[in-house]
Amino acid sequence: SKLPELEQFMLHKIYNLNLNFEKNFEIYNFHTLYKELLNFCTVDLSAFYFDIRKDTLYCDKLGSSKRKSTIVFLNILIEILLKLFAPILSFTTEEIYSLLKINTNKSIHLENFPKIPTHWNNKDLKNKWNELIKIREICNSSIEFKRAAKEIGSSLEANLIINLNEKMIKLVEGVDFSELCITSDAKIEKS
């Protein structure tokens, strides 16, 4: 089944991460390889994807399609990340691999590097989500300003009104900004 756009965007990120991994691995550029993996985990996953989807895992019904899609993505993610981190964190990845029993191989080090499907490379989706991330960053700055002024406690107390031009409104059609920005409500208005 088709994954939601956020998961598709993250698969696009994995596609590019893997391309860079292969390039750096071939030329023994392990420092850059590790830096890119770390950046992906801290910025793309922790500060972005997990921040948005954690409530889906904890709060949505067990059978909800969004929760199922999140779990499908997380399963894809762990298998790929284990293979990418294996040359760098050999003992840690070996232990995780043995606990998860992903495949019948006795060791993560007997696995091939991931073969990422080319359809994960989606430049249109990347462009759209790069714009959404910019909007999210502006919204988060506004929320932090209100938080610093002690007008709100958490982002969930915020009700956003996002002013966009007509072109941007069409681009972001169907996006739930309250979920993207982790607020109680978000409305789009034409500027």
Q: What does each model-found stretch correspond to?
A:
Residues 1-22, 50-142, 155-164:
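Acidic, turn-prone loop/beta-hairpin segments
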Residues 25-32:
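Short helix-adjacent coil turns
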Residues 34, 38-39:
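Aromatic-lined ligand-binding clefts that engage carbohydrates, nucleic acids, or primary amines
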Residues 42:
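Conserved oxyanion/phosphate-binding beta-strand-loop segments in alpha/beta enzyme cores
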Residues 144-151:
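Active-site phosphate-binding and catalytic loops of NTP-dependent enzymes
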Residues 149, 157-191:
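A broadly conserved sequence feature marking short terminus-proximal activation segments
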